[in-house]
Amino acid sequence: MGFAFDSRFDEISGGDITLKIREKAEGSRVQLPYYYYDILAEGVPVGRISIRTGDNFHTYYNGHIGYEVNEEARGHSYARRACELVLDAARFHGMTRLYITCAEDNAPSYRTIERLGGRLLEICEVPREYFAWYEGIPRHRIYQLDL
């Protein structure tokens, strides 16, 4: 039997933003099961967010949450607010802490993580064994968010 997704998390709303499920995947040996959403602000797409459940070696560098906000929609805290909305899904799946990561020099992203309450664990080189490693991959900021 595969990973048990919960349809209650297919659409999550809070304030003027809504997350609508784009894809669900059971994951693999390397990639964890995830929910992947479009972020909508008053019905207009402004970005995407994913929440990955479980843990493995790669999670530490990839993080449990990944987000991107369209360039023209930046500066409205959509990433932070979307992150807050997916936390219940993480809790539902038994998560008690999340890793959230970003490139060392990605100031908008690390400010988002810090505003969420993420605690910086380290800034590190990413090992070659990480599934998404590539030549020149930037150093990563690794944060932990306790749920």
Language-model regions: role of each:
Residues G2-Y60:
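Acetyl-CoA-dependent GNAT
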Residues Y34-Y36, I137-I142:
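Short hydrophobic/aromatic beta-strand or adjacent loop that forms the aromatic wall/cage
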Residues D38, S50, H64, E68, ...:
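Conserved beta-strand segments that form the floor/walls of ligand-binding pockets within enzyme
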Residues D55-I65, R74, H93-G94:
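A conserved beta-turn-beta hairpin within the catalytic core of GNAT-like acetyltransferases
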Residues Y67-V69, G75-D88, R111-R115:
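Conserved acetyl-CoA-binding loop-helix of GNAT-fold acetyltransferases
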Residues R91-T101:
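Conserved GNAT acetyl-CoA-binding A-motif
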Residues T101, R119-E135:
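Conserved catalytic-core motifs of GNAT/GCN5-like acyltransferases
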Residues D105-E122:
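Conserved active-site alpha-helix within GNAT-family acetyltransferase domains
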